[in-house]
């Protein structure tokens, strides 16, 4: 039914945020079937705590099982970052570095969270361009305080220019509603 509605309005689903609970062995076939039914070729894991070595290892092990399984079905697996992946966890690991070095998962880079972690989002996009096909373009003033585009401190114009130059799709995400969320 969803596919018919998408077709009726000329829409496509570029990706879904599907947590690991939707990618366990007991529901994986159903998740794959759903994505095929709606014509969606991208599954993005939207968040994992990764608070210690055990959590990082378990996540990486699961990703390394899921990725080839999904690829056989024509589905690409991605991970959506936040700022905590760029900071040492309770065991001193930097989860983003572990993900990059121990998997080949694609990245859906939330450029604001890279900025909020005191990293350069433009440099990150350039350095990992072969693993990034889509970004979240978002603004904020640091920490967990988002703003409407152009009202924060993140380098959104430079990020946008870089993403265009590198052929990356952009999801424009607003954490603020100034002036109304629709007008921005």
Residue ranges with predicted function:
Residues 5, 12-15, 20-107, 116:
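Active-site acidic/histidine proton-transfer and metal-coordination neighborhood
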Residues 5-7, 34, 126, 162:
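A general structural signal for stabilizing positions within well-ordered secondary structure
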Residues 39, 90, 96-109, 115-184:
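Histidine-acidic metal/acid-base catalytic patches
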Residues 1, 21, 48, 112, ...:
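Flexible loop residues that form catalytic
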Residues 7, 71, 164, 168:
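Short polybasic/polar patches that bind polyanions
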Residues 1-7, 144:
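Glycine-rich, proline-tolerant flexible connector loops at the mouths of alpha/beta enzymes
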């Amino acid at each position: 039914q969803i596919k018919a509605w998408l077709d009726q309005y000329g829409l496509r689903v570029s990706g879904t945020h599907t947590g690991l609970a939707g990618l366990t062995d007991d529901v994986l076939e159903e998740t794959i079937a759903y994505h095929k039914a709606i014509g969606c070729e991208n599954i993005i894991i939207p968040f994992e705590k990764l608070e210690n070595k055990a959590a990082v290892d378990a996540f990486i092990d699961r990703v390394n099982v899921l990725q080839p399984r999904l690829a056989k079905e024509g589905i690409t697996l991605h991970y959506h970052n936040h700022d905590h992946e760029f900071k040492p966890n309770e065991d001193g690991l930097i989860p983003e570095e572990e993900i990059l070095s121990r998997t080949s998962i694609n990245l859906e880079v939330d450029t604001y969270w890279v900025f909020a972690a005191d990293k350069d989002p433009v440099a990150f996009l350039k350095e990992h361009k072969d693993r990034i096909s889509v970004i979240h373009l978002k603004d904020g003033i640091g920490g967990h305080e988002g703003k409407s585009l152009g009202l924060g401190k993140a380098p959104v114009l430079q990020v946008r220019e870089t993403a265009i130059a590198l052929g990356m799709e952009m999801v424009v995400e607003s954490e603020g509603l100034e002036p109304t969320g629709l007008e921005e």
